[in-house]
Amino acid sequence: PYAGVNSAAANIVNVPLAAGSNGEAFREAIENHWLPRLEAFAPQLILISAGFDAHQADDMASLNLVDADFAWVTRCVCEQAEESAEGRIVSTLEGGYELRALARSVEAHIKAFLG
């Protein structure tokens, strides 16, 4: 759950991205902030709430991610699930409002999820 940018909760990692950020900034934030905390936590089950409104074609989040960025982060999470959770991972789909970009992003996510 969202608990604010400055949350001190141990189970929340908020890494705000500036409007207009692209996949490079997204990947850097994931690699430097989010994945180390996920690895340290070593979950026994991973739940993904996959939203795609950060796609560059979607005007909802003002970010510039592309399909490949969603596939990449999905692979990262799946790797962690293999390491700590015996592959136990569940994904649910959420937002994304530009339908063509949503379809491509969901396809990239599912392909990465299935390996």
Regions found by a protein language model. Name each.
Residues 22, 97-98:
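Glycine-/small-residue-rich active-site loops that bind phosphorylated ligands and cofactors
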Residues 1-76, 110-111:
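Conserved alpha-helical scaffold segments that buttress catalytic/binding sites
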Residues 81-88:
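A short helix->loop->beta-strand "cap" motif at the edges of active sites that frequently abuts
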Residues 55-58, 88, 98-102:
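Short active-site-adjacent structural elements
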Residues 66-67, 99-115:
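Short, electropositive alpha-helical surface patch
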